[in-house]
Amino acid sequence: AKPYIPTGELSRGSLSPKTPEETWRIIWQGCWPEVAEDTPKNRNIFFQSLLQTYIERDVILTGIRNLSDFRKFLTVLASRIGQEFQLNAVAAEVGVATQTAKQWLSIAESSGIIYLLPPFFENVGKTVIKRPKLFFTDTGFAAWLCKIPSPEALSKVYNNGSFFENFVVMELLKSWIHNGEEPYFYYYRDTRFNEIDLLIFDGTHYHPIEIKTSDSPQAGMIKAFDCIKGNTVKRGSGALICLTPKARYLSSDVVAHSIWDI
């Protein structure tokens, strides 16, 4: 498969389609080969040992004394996936100094636990948000840290859309990294509450992507795409990635399609 870029074409990937139930199971299980087809009990044991590995290998090496606080820190991060990362708020919730939280964030990022999606603010003015958005590299690990007991429960939690968005962003990111390509991924949000979940830069154009758990995509879901028009930015074709069983056009250059159609 090639690095994912919205092409404006209906027919795309060669992955077999999956139901929403199957999709939530994959998001809940995560993408580690050890748990992908395994039982909830074995999944629990695996993530427990994974956490232990992170702590022993990375945390102790960097001199973190309070391991339970670091676990709490990761759990707080997991509860905030898909949100703008606000260091002070996270530090306050964990009960540690802001500088400590900053150091721990750096460890979590360098260990490959989290991914920070940078904001886009090139030539758009001073009204855009300039904090990164927080994602976990594995949604299964995040769901485990949040103690979400099953795929069905995950599909019903208040922030299920954030878990779905996290999963989609990671799958798209992997399509670039596995092809040896440098991904130029951003998100857009301004103080007028306009938001574009993901912008992919292909070297000349920025391709806007909206991510929704809906199975019936509507044109109104992509109205924020117009935010980057009229600036010096060249906008490319876009996509709405969702749970729709069938791809369809939402405009002349925006296609709604499944995550399994990338």
Can you say where each PLM-predicted feature lies in the sequence?
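Interdomain hinge/linker elements that couple catalytic modules in large macromolecular machines
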Residues: K2-E171, S175-I177, P183
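Domain-level recognition of nuclease-like catalytic cores that cleave nucleotide substrates
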Residues: Y4, T244-I262
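Switch/connector loops and helix/strand junctions flanking conserved nucleotide-binding motifs
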Residues: W144, Q218-G220, A247-S251
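Conserved catalytic cores of phosphodiester-cleaving nucleases, focusing on short active-site segments
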Residues: V168, L172, I196-D215, G238
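Arginine/glycine-rich "motif VI" loop of SF2 helicases in the C-terminal RecA-like domain
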Residues: I177-H178, C227-R235
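Active-site metal-binding core of divalent-cation-utilizing nuclease and nuclease-like domains
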Residues: E182-I196, I200-D202
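Active-site-adjacent loop/helix micro-motif of nuclease/hydrolase catalytic cores
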Residues: D215-F225
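Short, hydrophobic beta-strand segments that form beta-sheet elements in well-ordered domains
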Residues: G236-C242
